[in-house]
Amino acid sequence: TFAVFGEVEANQRDYNVAAVSDGFSRDSDGQRYRAGIDFGSTGQIVRGEMSIGYGNQNPSDAGLSDVDGVLIDANVAWRLSDPTTLRFIARTDIFDTNTTGSAGVLSRTIGLEARHAFRRYVIATAGIAYTDQDYDNVPINESELRASLLLEYYLNRDWTLFGQWETIDFDSNQPGNSWTANDVRVGARWRQ
């Protein structure tokens, strides 16, 4: 299957108080315009959707400038074989910030994930993603590199045992704001 789509989104963000950092209200109105393609179905080798567009967020406070940029989004799965799938993701959006003098952040993420079923009940997933955050109107740039490994053992339809490791390397051009973290989780999940 193959389909072309267009998407228009509007938002209104209202906050009860102004930001403590600079006294400006972060209330805003925003729009997102996207055009893209949707292709494939569950049984096909390649399936997913991709879009490109434009987004803007207009603060109600005249002391802050508009935040806008090109939006690129994708979620594409490629089934290499019955037990193995690669997934490519890309996301772009505008987020609020209370950073002094900035109305928002243009955030861009790109990632790759591999999923392999060793058996029907043993599945491993490895992923890596990079995020760049560009602050509007201030010289702050931040990036994040995230890698993860997940192993799942399905006991039955309801219970899953899992082990997960994730590392995050956060980098900022602001002194003292860079950090690295590792997270290990082991547990059981119940779904019904």
Predicted features and spans:
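Alpha-helical scaffold segments of alpha-solenoid architecture
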Residues: 37, 46-49, 59-63, 68-101, ...
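Outer-membrane beta-barrel "beta-signal"
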Residues: 151-154, 158-160, 164, 180-192
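Acidic, glycine-rich loop-and-beta core segments that form the ion-binding/anion-interacting portion
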Residues: 9-73
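C-terminal structural cap/anchor segments
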Residues: 84-135, 142-144
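Repeated loop/turn-to-beta-strand initiation elements of outer-membrane beta-barrel proteins
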Residues: 1-6, 43-50, 82-88, 120-126, ...
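Transmembrane beta-strands of outer-membrane beta-barrel pores
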Residues: 10-14, 41-43, 52-58, 90-96, ...
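Residues on the lipid-exposed face of transmembrane beta-strands in outer-membrane beta-barrel proteins
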Residues: 35-39, 74-78, 112-116, 149-153, ...
